[in-house]
Amino acid sequence: MNQDTQSANTQQEKKIAYNFNKLQKRLRRNVGNAIADFNMIEDGDKVMVCLSGGKDSYTLLDILLNLKLSAPIHFDIVAVNLDQKQPGFPEHTLPEYLESIGVEYKIVEENTYGIVKEKIPEGKTTCSLCSRLRRGILYRTATELGATKIALGHHRDDMLETLFLNMFYGGKLKSMPPKLISDDGKQIVIRPLAYCKEKDIEKYSQAKQFPIIPCNLCGSQPNLQRQVVKEMLQTWDRQYPGRIETMFSAMQNITLSHLCDPSLFDFKGLKLGQVLDGVEGDIAFDKAEIPNQPLIQDEDEQTTDYGENGMIQFKQVQ
């Protein structure tokens, strides 16, 4: 190898390392902001990270472990995988990976695959029943482990897809919450990747070479409605840069008095002479001030924060 080739290789290696560090910093910042904005993790928490073997949950675990090293609070992490006894599931993959990084983990074995195959006709989407079964098992496991928070790997794009799915097919203005409490009040579920782009997670997963487990082992048909919405958003992202960022920002800037749900705003109770603090009544007659350009964020030069006041409260990233 001549000197010019060595120099070119060195430059390429430096560029790859630089881009990876920038990507990791961006993910850490977004996760830290989400944790701070929604008070996802508190001092003394035991966080149960649900690990499926896909890119999202691997990235979630990796970033949380990274933040834990220098967070201003103490919290513990335990990774949990549900082995649903799907044919061809590589049982050795996750234990080997988790042991290699030295994280506490538990593999829960439940034959939900058999239950789903028995209940759902061949060729139909099994995701709904499978999800309900998984939820119950994971709630039970969290209680057994003494976990105070259950962390899932849903990201910004998942939340937007769910918003449009509910609007298009369910007639509801509803998405995935970044933090929720179970119906019985015993479990708190958090989504620390709420501010993270799927494209960033894909790049990070490839760079880290996580041992990905395919998500189609169950043989279920894909959710066609979700796939349609996903492709729609991807098309918008290509054709109208910044639209995705603007839509996600809209989910955090809601004016209830300008929607139509009487259970959330007392339209019937409005009377002459009232002055309502924080209600933008007068602007109903004004022309809406809409920026000429959406919130544009280059995927490799992201500077805009979704976090509250743009501040990183959970973890200052250098």
Swiss-Prot record:
[4Fe-4S] cluster binds at C127, C130, C218. Pathway: tRNA modification. A motif (PP-loop motif) lies at residues 52-57. InterPro entries: Rossmann-like_a/b/a_fold, TilS/TtcA_N, tRNA_Cyd_32_2_STrfase, tRNA_thiolation_TtcA_Ctu1. GO terms for biological process: tRNA thio-modification. Its cofactor is Mg(2+); [4Fe-4S] cluster. SUPFAM superfamilies: Adenine nucleotide alpha hydrolases-like. It catalyses: cytidine(32) in tRNA + S-sulfanyl-L-cysteinyl-[cysteine desulfurase] + AH2 + ATP = 2-thiocytidine(32) in tRNA + L-cysteinyl-[cysteine desulfurase] + A + AMP + diphosphate + H(+). It is found in: Cytoplasm. GO terms for molecular function: 4 iron, 4 sulfur cluster binding; ATP binding; magnesium ion binding; sulfurtransferase activity; tRNA binding. It comes from the Bacteria. The keyword Ribonucleoprotein does not apply. Its EC number is 2.8.1.-. Gene3D superfamilies: HUPs (3.40.50.620). Homodimer. Belongs to the TtcA family. The thiolation reaction likely consists of two steps: a first activation step by ATP to form an adenylated intermediate of the target base of tRNA, and a second nucleophilic substitution step of the sulfur (S) atom supplied by the hydrosulfide attached to the Fe-S cluster. Catalyzes the ATP-dependent 2-thiolation of cytidine in position 32 of tRNA, to form 2-thiocytidine (s(2)C32). The sulfur atoms are provided by the cysteine/cysteine desulfurase (IscS) system. This is tRNA-cytidine(32) 2-sulfurtransferase. It comes from Actinobacillus pleuropneumoniae serotype 7 (strain AP76).
